[in-house]
Amino acid sequence: GCNQFCSYCIIPYARGRVRSRNVQNVLEEVKRLAASGYQEVVLTGIHLSSYGIDCGESLLHLIQMVHQVEGIRRIRLGSLEPRIVTETFAEELAKMEKICPHFHLSLQSGCDATLARMNRKYTTEEYENACSILRKNFTHPAITTDVIVGFPGETEEEFAQTKEYLKRIHFYEMHIFKYSRRQGTRAAVMEHQVPEEIKTKRSAQLLALAESMSREFRAYYVGKEEEVLFEEPMEVDGETWYTGYTKEYVKIAAKTAEPLDNVMKRGRVEAALTDEIYRMKL
């Protein structure tokens, strides 16, 4: 569940309030996964940042406990709210070698007026500060986000503010959504609903920006040695490559005579194999 009541979201009405899984229950599942050979786990939830508020626990403590499970070599976090990213939170995460420096911070808009109508509980300044804290504590972390275009009342000026803000933060990946009404939410009955054709136009602009920033982020790794957890084979131009991900969630492909399912290897990133996959020499 969720306690946030963003004006566009039906989840608090449909799924109720936050209900956290017991720490021991989570640890038991992680241990079962490790015993089955899994090396990476993702801690996720509808509103992950609120973990523990209903039972006297905290997300940081849960992460620290999962970090102690033998056999698990990577811990990836699901979507976070910027308010959880304090100096202490980031410093503690940076001490844990299993943490993947891949942080999905939901933004939704780069305009404070739009954020207020959305009932998001932070400002663009607070969000930017969270990104700065992460970049101070991790080397080239992957910061990804969600953005809604065409929210009721979003003017051309507000959209322009969002676009410039996104350029300044410089994300690895952005999930762009056109606002759609959810019956029963406050936003559904707001005035100044944005026409569909304008939403489509704004979405196209941000998708192009997202592709450009993503290419730039991935290109940073060319020539660098990285560790990849390989997952599965794929065919590219009639050749078989094994693909997997770095800790920053950059997709990598390598040619090899041996199967690499669930194998972790280091290699040097060479160049782009496709628009979204970089090849590696093992």
Enumerate the predicted regions with their spans.
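Aromatic/hydrophobic pocket-lining residues that form the small-molecule binding cavity
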Residues: V26, L59, Y127, F159-T162, ...
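Hydrophobic, well-ordered secondary-structure elements that form the walls
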Residues: L105, D146, L166, M174, ...
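Terminal RNA-binding accessory module
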Residues: V189-L282
